[in-house]
Swiss-Prot record:
Gene: hisH
Active site: C81, H186, E188
GO BP term, pick one: L-histidine biosynthetic process
Protein name: Imidazole glycerol phosphate synthase subunit HisH
UniProt xrefs under CDD domains: GATase1_IGP_Synthase
Record's function text: IGPS catalyzes the conversion of PRFAR and glutamine to IGP, AICAR and glutamate. The HisH subunit catalyzes the hydrolysis of glutamine to glutamate and ammonia as part of the synthesis of IGP and AICAR. The resulting ammonia molecule is channeled to the active site of HisF.
Organism superkingdom: Bacteria
Organism field: Nostoc punctiforme (strain ATCC 29133 / PCC 73102)
């Protein structure tokens, strides 16, 4: 089974992500060792919490460059929730620079009379990259689970893989470009749809492993 490094940088419970990856047919390895990131077949960067502590913890553990190197090498990479946001250059939530792997900013939802912030609960994805490997074997407009007050705004619209609409605001819910994929929602909390998305990622990892 492919070994997937789940990056541990003290930002949230990793247990449910690991359980999801196991169900999808992978062997998760929770780690903050740059060497183990290099040896793994793929990397998952999960995370819940605030932007500034997240990037501070990553940098304190010396993980910024190993993550950038892994992505540049073509290793399959999946960011989840905060693990999507910190790939960007900056966030309205904090003052720390993000990893800057993706050009663009993290913005806060504008208040509207009939919406709650954080955006919390189930919402429907609208696919903007219909052929992305993440969406294989999914129904159209699938429901997935969100908990967030901020969303990513990439400069290049072509990397946007899906959007959601909250009130009158349509925002990026997932990005995908070559081996780099990341989602704002929680696949590990999104029932069978989420498991299929994780399985699609694991299938791509398996394809890249030399026979």
């Amino acid at each position: 089974m492919p070994v997937i490094a789940v990056v541990d940088y003290e930002m949230g419970n990793l247990h449910s992500v690991c359980k999801g990856l196991e169900k999808a047919g992978a062997t998760p390895n929770v780690t903050y060792s740059p060497k183990e990131l290099e040896q793994a077949d793929a990397i998952v960067l999960p995370g819940v919490g605030a932007f500034d502590p997240a990037v501070q913890h990553l940098r304190a553990r010396g993980l910024e460059q190993p993550i950038k190197d892994a992505i540049a090498s073509g290793k399959p990479f999946l960011g989840i929730c905060l693990g999507l946001q910190i790939l960007f250059e900056s966030s309205a939530e904090g003052t720390q620079p993000g990893l800057g792997i993706i050009k663009g900013k993290v913005r806060r939802f504008r208040p509207e009379p009939d919406i709650t912030i954080p955006h919390m609960g189930w919402n429907q994805l609208e696919m903007t990259q219909a052929k992305s490997i993440l969406w294989e074997h999914l129904p159209s407009d699938p429901w997935v689970y969100f908990v967030h007050s901020y969303y990513v705004d990439p400069i290049d619209p072509l990397i946007r893989a899906a959007t959601i609409t909250h009130g009158t605001q349509t925002v990026t819910a997932a990005i995908a470009h070559e081996n780099l994929m990341a989602v704002q929602f929680h696949p590990e909390k999104s029932s069978n749809i989420g498991l299929q998305i994780l399985s699609n990622f694991v299938a791509q990892v398996r394809e890249k492993i030399p026979a």
